[in-house]
């Protein structure tokens, strides 16, 4: 362990380490609300509400302070919060590398390389919890090294308190536990295991963790957002532990799927550091004391385990491996420091080569800065804001709007709660999490939220005297009352009484009011932005078809397919539409594209089943539907599709079995019951 370093770092280097990322991050940040969780998190901070599990109380409280800064829109202020915590993370990593190596140059190179890696930089442009999380990861590593220098109890006490605060932002902090426990127990465990000290440390940890009392307090106070209503013990624990979906995340995939995910994780890390991984490996081998070599290896190992085995979210939409990247930056710095020492000894009589090597090290951060600038520059990205404007420009006065899908719900949440848009419109989200429907069950549970909502939703559609609109990406999944049929209406959908379509049912006027700059702009779009842009163009293509402009519609739909080139859902939905219009050859091409990017292979098999169904090859359709059911046995839609194919194939008894399986999963399907009755299949 190095002795105390009296001179921490020259001010000039500190200024560069802080100022350069500040300037770059602020220049490239999104100017308003972003897609994904950004709208929900911003609205939660603005209203001191409760976002999705685990509730993120510390994020909401700090975010509220940023919302009060009178600079730009609220969405921009929250994006700046992400940037600022990324800058603090960069400074802490610099501090740690310098403490380990006492080398200003290696600290500079390793730190600024980290600052401009895509995985960190991309999180600075929008309101998300990840830069606050990695700030705590870096802070905890820095505090732990500080404690390990002389084992002062006050330092470990501070570390424990900050650990509790870190849990107040993100539960992934627990993945640091094995590495931290090893350092502590291999260091000075006797003092820590003293009963008095242990009680004091436990009290400090619980004091910091008491941040979570924010959840029931704000729920009782009637916060505008109170996801999960965590004001009872059961709901509080369910929300904090994310039990509603965690059981579906942990060890639910096949061996081959985990191998594939592990490969994706490894490729993601390699894409961030490239050949510098060899320098990081050298830095790890030269890390002293040996205990810290084990510590850094353990952090990477357990972060990898979390990424691969404890989560199923796509790498396209979530910032995985950030703790690993923090560690790798430290190891790169240590590796560069060792290489420079060896080069200096080898060049004792000639400083030219050594000077060239130092100059090369200074240039290292320029590589990610230049190569990733276009990828991370979101300064022209208004996509989420334009989407919520377009939604509200579609709906009529005093209408009812149902929402489904994060990229519909969360931008509207921002617009409604933060900017008070269209307060004449009644908004409901179909899962009843943010915009609650009336007459709900008192015993709310996230597990039964979806199913318990259908009957209430149907009653609203049946009894409303106002226009009904749906902002959904999968209208076929909406179970309408039997006398209604869903039709596209601009970028939204509207239920109309079957066979009773007014002339304006296509939403022609809405298309003339839409904002399309971001959908048409050429700035780099991540997966979520590509999906939204592809959705917009696909809806436009459908509208053109409906108005008799088939050739232009095909051209626009082809563009939608190109924009969503790696989007299984987009290709599948386009294929379904083209099949319905009789373009079976073009539909087959889209289905083949969907197979390449098979995030939802069950859905792809379902669409192949529909393709064969349209061809009249019912046996192949049955085979495809059965494959889909094997992958997603809880999907009642898949059983309905199988039942229809079996019925057409003349296998009435098997069709009845399939429909009964569907009704067992979701009894509230009046159209299915009507089909069974009309075809004597009950």
Residue ranges and their predicted role:
Residues 26-28, 48, 60, 71-79, ...:
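Aromatic- and kink-enriched transmembrane "portal" helix at the membrane-lumen/periplasm boundary
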Residues 11-17, 93-116, 135, 294, ...:
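Transmembrane-helix signature of polytopic, membrane-embedded enzymes
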Residues 99-104, 124, 140-158, 163-166, ...:
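Membrane-interface transmembrane helices that cradle and orient dolichyl/undecaprenyl
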Residues 149, 175-206, 364-365:
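Perimembrane helix-loop-helix junctions
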Residues 15-18, 80-101, 136-143, 282, ...:
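Transmembrane-helix motifs of polytopic, lipid-linked glycan transferases
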Residues 269-291:
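Hydrophobic, aromatic-rich transmembrane alpha-helices
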Residues 44-47, 110-112, 155-169, 181-183:
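Membrane-interface alpha helices of multi-pass inner-membrane proteins
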Residues 389-400, 410-413, 419-682:
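C-terminal luminal/periplasmic domains and tails of membrane-associated envelope-modifying transferases
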């Amino acid at each position: 362990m190095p002795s105390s370093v009296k001179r921490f770092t020259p001010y000039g280097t500190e200024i560069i380490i802080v100022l350069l990322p500040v300037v770059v991050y602020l220049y490239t940040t999104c100017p308003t609300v972003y897609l994904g969780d950004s709208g929900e998190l911003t609205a939660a901070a603005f209203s001191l509400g409760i976002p999705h599990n685990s509730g993120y109380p510390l994020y909401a409280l700090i975010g509220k302070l940023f919302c009060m800064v009178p600079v730009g829109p609220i969405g921009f202020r929250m994006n700046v919060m992400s940037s600022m915590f990324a800058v603090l993370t960069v400074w802490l990593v610099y501090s740690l590398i310098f403490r380990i190596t006492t080398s200003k140059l290696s600290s500079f190179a390793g730190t600024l390389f980290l600052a401009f890696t895509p995985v960190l930089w991309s999180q600075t442009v929008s309101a998300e919890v990840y830069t606050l999380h990695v700030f705590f990861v870096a802070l905890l590593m820095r505090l732990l090294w500080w404690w390990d220098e002389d084992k002062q109890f006050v330092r470990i006490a501070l570390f424990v308190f900050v650990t509790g605060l870190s849990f107040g932002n993100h539960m992934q902090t627990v993945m640091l536990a094995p590495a931290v426990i090893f350092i502590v127990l291999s260091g000075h465990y006797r003092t820590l295991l003293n009963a008095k000290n242990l009680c004091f440390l436990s009290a400090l940890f619980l004091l910091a963790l008491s941040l979570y009392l924010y959840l029931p307090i704000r729920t009782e106070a009637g916060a505008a957002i109170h996801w999960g209503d965590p004001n009872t013990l059961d709901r509080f624990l369910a929300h904090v532990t994310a039990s509603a979906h965690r059981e579906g995340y942990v060890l639910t995939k096949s061996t081959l799927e985990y191998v594939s995910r592990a490969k994706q994780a490894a490729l993601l890390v390699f894409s961030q550091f490239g050949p510098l991984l060899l320098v990081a490996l050298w830095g790890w081998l030269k890390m002293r004391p040996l205990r810290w070599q084990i510590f850094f290896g353990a952090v990477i190992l357990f972060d990898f385990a979390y990424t691969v085995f404890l989560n199923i979210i796509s790498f396209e939409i979530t910032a995985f491996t950030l703790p690993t990247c923090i560690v790798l930056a430290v190891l790169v710095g240590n590796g560069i420091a060792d290489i420079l020492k060896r080069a200096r000894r080898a060049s004792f009589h000639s400083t030219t080569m050594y000077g060239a090597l130092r100059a090369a090290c200074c240039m290292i951060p320029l590589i990610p800065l230049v190569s990733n600038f276009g990828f991370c520059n979101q300064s022209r990205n208004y996509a989420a804001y334009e989407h919520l404007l377009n939604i509200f420009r579609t709906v009529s006065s005093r209408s009812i709007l149902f929402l489904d899908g994060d990229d519909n719900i969360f931008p509207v949440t921002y617009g409604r709660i933060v900017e008070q848009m269209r307060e004449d419109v009644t908004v409901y989200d179909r899962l009843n999490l943010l915009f609650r429907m009336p007459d709900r069950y008192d015993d709310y549970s996230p597990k039964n939220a979806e199913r318990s909502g259908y009957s209430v939703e149907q009653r609203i559609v049946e009894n409303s005297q106002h226009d009904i609109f749906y902002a959904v990406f999968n209208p076929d999944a909406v179970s309408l009352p039997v006398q209604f049929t869903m039709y596209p209406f601009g970028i939204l959908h509207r239920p109309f009484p079957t066979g009773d379509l007014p002339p304006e049912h296509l939403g022609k006027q809405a298309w003339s009011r839409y904002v399309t700059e971001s959908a048409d702009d050429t700035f780099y779009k991540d997966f979520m932005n590509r999906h939204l842009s592809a959705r917009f163009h696909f809806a436009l293509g459908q509208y053109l078809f409906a108005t008799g402009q088939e050739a232009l519609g095909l051209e626009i739909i082809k563009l939608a397919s190109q924009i969503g080139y790696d989007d299984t859902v987009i290709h599948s939905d386009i294929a379904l539409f083209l099949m319905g219009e009789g373009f079976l050859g073009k539909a087959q091409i889209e289905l083949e594209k969907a197979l390449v990017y098979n995030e939802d292979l069950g859905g792809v098999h379902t669409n192949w089943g529909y393709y064969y169904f349209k061809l009249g090859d019912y046996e192949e359709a049955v085979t495809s539907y059965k494959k889909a059911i094997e992958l997603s046995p809880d999907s009642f839609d898949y059983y309905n599709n199988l039942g229809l194919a079996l019925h057409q194939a003349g296998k009435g008894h098997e069709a009845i079995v399939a429909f009964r399986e569907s009704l067992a999963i979701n009894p509230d399907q009046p159209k299915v019951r009507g089909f069974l009755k009309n075809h004597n299949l009950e």
